[in-house]
Design a protein with these regions (language model features):
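Predominantly soluble domains enriched in secretory-pathway, periplasmic, or organellar proteins
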Residues: 1-111
Length: 111
């Protein structure tokens, strides 16, 4: 679960192959669903670029969702380590850090 700069929450639905978007105020409610085949799992948010990053474990990819429009826009998926489980983003540089199931492997993806 991550929060964006608008105070919305993004949650991965691994079994449903989607990212779910929620508004919290005045009461919590789902405001969006983005279908992502490939078992979305890890999630990170870059507030500078207003981009959500999601790992797709079944495809060995990470994909960005641009959130600066009314409807999230998918970026081109990027290949990653085997079964990427976690992702982090350095908002100063846009650099991504991805780890998977291989012991000791950290992939760094430059913007």
């Amino acid at each position: 679960v991550v929060a964006d700069k608008r105070g919305h929450l993004a949650v991965t639905d691994t079994r449903g192959n989607a990212v779910l978007l929620y508004e919290l105020s005045p009461t919590p409610r789902q405001i969006g669903r983005v279908e992502l085949p490939g078992t979305p799992y890890g999630i990170a948010y870059d507030p500078v670029r207003d981009r959500l990053w999601v790992t797709l474990t079944a495809l060995n990819e990470v994909i960005g969702l641009n959130l600066n429009a009314n409807t999230p826009v998918l970026a081109t998926p990027l290949p990653t380590v085997r079964q990427p489980n976690t992702v982090a983003v350095d908002s100063a540089t846009g650099r991504l850090f991805v780890t998977g199931t291989d012991e000791g492997v950290l992939e760094i993806i430059e913007p």
